[in-house]
């Protein structure tokens, strides 16, 4: 009887594994189909419209050279040397970023950690001050973290951005719901316990055991200038809406929000910042992104919108 029960559980487990594998494969197939359709649509549109070719000349030229879809058609290739290792006491792989340890989850090998880091630095180009065509870059000359700012990193993942600015910040809130990042995040932040606060919750419009609202979280920072960075898979407009009263009432707020996840995100966020009278800019260059929806014409998307009511001399 026990053997039959065990066999039934094993068969059920195998069935569930097959189901999730097929579901994952189907999802990846749909993404690949959307990417190919987007690439072909851009080629057709560029042949039919000279205005379109001129507006997106940089991106179209690189797509033609590659002969395929790419997330970053604005960017040139870039390489970087990476110092890395494995921490035996923590059992975590790491890379060195500006002399600081940036840890990755235990399921990563050291080689995988290096690949991920190179992706952030060379592929995504998350860091920098907007000097080059890097549509995913969070800061620019006019919208950046200043000494003494309270930084709120919403969707921090490995916390590369926070680690990059932690010396300038007076305090950093790192918000990340995905539990895979908790152990490496705590290791990365260990030298900065006096200024780093990790919040393992989903950002929402209300507070609960699993959610946190930014207005509630930031009540105790009423006198500090804020730099709020968001990369939360298309939920940026929803979260910014919860912030509108705060954005109207307080001085000294700068935001950097991803706009590439969904077709309407850039336009929606632009309208929201216009409502509160913030000056704003989009990052240089465009992205192609087809993970969550089929890109609509003109297909190329702004990567990040930066907005602020701060005036720095």
Q: Which residues does each predicted region cover?
A:
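A short acidic, amphipathic alpha-helical/loop segment
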Residues: 164, 168, 184-188, 239-246, ...
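Conserved beta-strand signature within the Rossmann-like core of class I S-adenosyl-L-methionine
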Residues: 228, 251-260
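Conserved S-adenosyl-L-methionine
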Residues: 155, 229-233
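Short SAM/SAH-binding signature in class I
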Residues: 223-229
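Active-site beta-loop-alpha junctions enriched in small/polar residues
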Residues: 204, 260-262, 285
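S-adenosyl-L-methionine
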Residues: 2-168, 173-175, 178-222, 266-267, ...
């Amino acid at each position: 009887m026990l053997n039959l029960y065990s066999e039934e559980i094993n068969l059920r487990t195998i069935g569930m594994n097959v189901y999730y594998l097929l579901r994952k494969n189907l999802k990846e197939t749909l993404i690949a189909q959307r990417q190919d359709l987007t690439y072909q649509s851009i080629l057709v549109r560029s042949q039919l419209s000279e205005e379109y070719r001129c507006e997106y000349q940089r991106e179209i030229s690189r797509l033609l050279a590659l002969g395929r879809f790419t997330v970053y058609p604005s960017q040139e290739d870039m390489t970087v040397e990476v110092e890395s290792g494995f921490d035996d006491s923590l059992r975590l792989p790491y890379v060195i970023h500006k002399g600081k340890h940036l840890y990755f989850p235990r399921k990563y090998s050291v080689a995988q950690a290096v690949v991920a880091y190179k992706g952030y630095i060379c592929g995504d180009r998350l860091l920098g001050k907007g000097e080059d065509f890097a549509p995913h870059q969070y800061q620019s000359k006019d919208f950046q973290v200043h000494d003494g700012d309270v930084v709120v990193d919403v969707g921090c993942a490995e916390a590369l951005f926070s680690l990059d600015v932690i010396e300038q910040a007076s305090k950093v809130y790192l918000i990340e719901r995905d539990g895979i990042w908790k152990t490496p995040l705590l290791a990365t932040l260990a030298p900065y316990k006096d200024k780093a606060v990790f919040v393992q919750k989903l950002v929402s419009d209300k507070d609960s055991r699993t959610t946190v609202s930014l207005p509630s979280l930031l009540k105790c920072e009423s006198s500090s200038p804020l730099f709020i960075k968001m990369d939360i898979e298309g939920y940026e407009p929803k979260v910014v809406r919860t912030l509108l009263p705060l954005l109207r009432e307080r001085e000294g707020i700068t935001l950097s929000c991803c706009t590439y996840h969904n077709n309407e995100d850039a336009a929606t966020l632009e309208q929201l910042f216009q409502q509160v009278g913030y000056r704003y800019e989009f990052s240089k260059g465009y992205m192609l992104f087809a993970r969550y929806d089929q890109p609509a014409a003109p297909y190329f998307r702004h990567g990040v919108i930066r907005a602020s009511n701060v005036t720095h001399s």
